[in-house]
Amino acid sequence: TGLSIALVMTLFIIFYVKFAPIYPEYNRNRMLTVTKMKSYPKDNDKSWNCSAVSYDEVKMLQDLPHLEAIGATASNYRENYVEVPDNNEPISVTPLYTDAGFWKVFTFRFLHGKPFTQADIDAKHREVVLPVSVARKLFATDDVVGRRFNMDAQEYRVCGVVEDVSAATPSSVGDMWLPITLNSWVTSDTTGKLVGSVGIYMTAPDAEDKEALKEEVR
């Protein structure tokens, strides 16, 4: 019947969006994610702690033999407010904080400019990549590299503009992307533990290398 066909098509679309290679997550078939970590004393597995992952783990994993790229993301668990020119009402945004490797793991289409660099991240420069819809909302145009705006009373500079990202790709979507070192949850995590506040994303050179990379991570 028509209803059963519609249901099958709906399930197919959901499955496709969740698992197929779609923008900007084209590398799903060779990607590994580490977004949760459970830690406990060697002699007591009942006393455990489960959380996101420490940013220190990026350094621990970056020399694995079957690793092509590794990146990290973090949220600040709250909304930020951007001042819009000629508008008394600020707009709320939810940024995604990333490192330089993020732009190698995920394949964004840059319309203008480029991503922030490792030097920007190390220096905590307030560089930002905007999706085109947010760029137009803030500046009424999309070629805005070098333009500046205020968010939560801090000035930021636009270094790149990308095609919009769908909410169906939660690992990479954001209202804007900022250097991960601007996230206080990440920079305050100096305990040296495996648990922390980031998610880690890795790609193997080929889909055939994914299982080998998984074993190396373990």
Protein language model regions, located:
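N-terminal Sec/SRP start-transfer signal
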Residues: 1-8
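Generic structural signal for small/hydrophobic residues in well-ordered secondary structure
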Residues: 1, 18-20, 32-36, 61, ...
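A structure-centric signal for secondary-structure junctions around beta-strands
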Residues: 28-31, 90-92, 124, 155, ...
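Conserved SAM-binding loop
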Residues: 7, 95, 202
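Membrane-proximal extracellular/periplasmic loop immediately following the first transmembrane helix
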Residues: 12-82, 196-198
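Short acidic/polar micro-motifs at solvent-exposed secondary-structure junctions
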Residues: 37-51, 72-101, 115-127, 166
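Mid-to-C-terminal secondary-structure elements
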Residues: 99-115, 126-218
